[in-house]
Amino acid sequence: MVRPGQVRQRPGFLQQWGPVLAVGAIVILALGLGLRGLGSQAAPGQATAPTSALSAQPASAEGPTGPTTGPVRMANQGAAHIQPGQAHPPYNSNPPTSGWHYETPAAPGVYDQPIADETLVHNLEHGYVIISYNCARLEGIGCDELKANLKNLFELKRGWKIIVVPRPSLDTGIALTAWEVIDKFNTYDQSRIEDFIARFRDQGPEKTQS
C-alpha cells in the first residue's frame, strides 16, 4: 500500500511480465511434447516395424521345410541384379526372401500363373508381401475357395504391395514372404495373413510408392 506523500515505484519488467512468460513457456513445452508424440505414431495404413522378438531371432541360413509356427527370419543373401536367365547360387528358402533378382519387378495383383523367383525377389526388396499357394498341399479348404478368399483379401488391403501367386514347388499350402521373413502353413488363416501384412509390408530395403 502506498501512503500519501510517497512516490509509487513502477514494477520491473520481470515483476510485471514474469508470470505471463512462465505460462507461455509451459504452453509451448506442452505443445512440443504433444506434436512429438503424434509424430512417433504410425500413419493410418502404414506398416509397423517387425516385433523385437523376431528382430532378435538369429537369422536362419536354411529355410524351413514344412509348416512353421510363425514368421522366421532368414539370412540376407544380398540384392544383386542379374540378367534374365543368368545363373546364380541357390536361394536359402522356398520361396526366397532375398538375393539375386531381375531389374523389373512384377505389378501388384492376383496371378493365375507362377512368376519367376528372380522377379518376385525384386518386389520383396520394394517391401512387398507375397502370398504363394499350392493347392495340392492345402488342408481344410478347397482350391477355388482359397483363391476367392485370397482375392477378397487382396481387395480388402487395396492391393498395395501385395502379390498372390501359385507356386507348384511349395511344400506347404500357403507361404507368406517379405524381405528376410517367411511363414508357412497348410490351412487358410486370414488373421495370420493379415498380421503378417501389418508387420512386414513396406519393410524392404528400398522404399517405393508401389
Describe each PLM feature range.
Residues G32-T51:
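C-terminal region of N-terminal signal peptides and the immediate post-cleavage residues
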Residues G109-K157:
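Mid-length scaffold segments of soluble, non-membrane domains
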Residues L14-Q15, L54:
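N-terminal organelle transit peptides
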Residues M1-L14:
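Terminal targeting segments of Actinobacterial cell-envelope proteins
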Residues N149-S210:
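Helix-rich interaction surfaces within compact, conserved domain-sized segments
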Residues A47-A61:
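Low-complexity, Pro/Thr/Ser/Glu-rich flexible segments characteristic
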Residues V20-G34:
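Hydrophobic membrane-insertion alpha-helices, especially the h-region
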Residues P58-T119:
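Surface-exposed, low-hydrophobicity interaction/linker segments
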